[in-house]
Amino acid sequence: VSLEPCSHYGKTPPCADLIIEKQIPRIVIGCRDPFSKVAGRGIQKLKDAGREVIVGVLETECRQLIRRFITFHTLRRPYITLKWAESSDRYIDYSRTDGKPVILSSPLTSMLVHKKRAEHSAILVGTRTAELDNPGLNVRHWYGRSPVRIVLDRQQKLSPSLHLFDGSVPTLVFTEIPHAPLPVSYTHLRAHETRRHLV
């Protein structure tokens, strides 16, 4: 297995108990679970039940497979993916005020962007992107759940008529204005269980 079998009751019963119950004699584990409720307890439970346990096989590859989980539990922050599109002459955008987005993506890359959105818990943009592109930041060209939308609107100047505020997906706005009537702390992101952010 890529990750140490759990030894506690969460959303499901302990995986270690099932392995013991099914009398699996040898367990090969890629990496230890950094989650505080497991953190070696699953391995110990298996050993105490007389099972042979080998830990660290293809550990680097296993950690890469579960990098979002590892980042969340070791660094106490979301796994962040940076995404941008640029033209062949290395431009990201041109000066404009018309609210029409610059299309730099092909239909295939657009689909892949929506796939990435579906794989992330939240997506973040700044004020200028919100104003100029009026993006929905939802999942349309792929299947899956749309991420929570996060907007950095320092002066709280965005129009409530933007697609970001259509109510179809939760939107969090971060501002510098004291006592702003909007969620402004990281605890709101934790409440939404945002563990993977696309920026």
Question: Can you say where each PLM-predicted feature lies in the sequence?
Answer:
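Zn2+-dependent cytidine deaminase-like catalytic core
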Residues: 1-61, 148, 176-177
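Glycine-rich nucleotide phosphate-binding loop and flanking beta-alpha elements
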Residues: 7, 35, 130-131, 158, ...
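Structural motif corresponding to alpha-helix initiation and N-cap regions
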Residues: 12-13, 40, 59, 63-67, ...
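Alpha-helical scaffold segments in soluble metabolic enzymes
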Residues: 18, 45, 64, 68, ...
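Short secondary-structure boundary/hinge segments and terminal tails
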Residues: 37, 63-65, 133-135
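Flexible, polar/acidic helix-loop-strand segments at domain edges
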Residues: 66-76
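Active-site ligand-binding patch in enzyme domains
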Residues: 71, 79-190
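Single conserved hydrophobic/aromatic residue that forms the stacking wall/gate
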Residues: 188-199
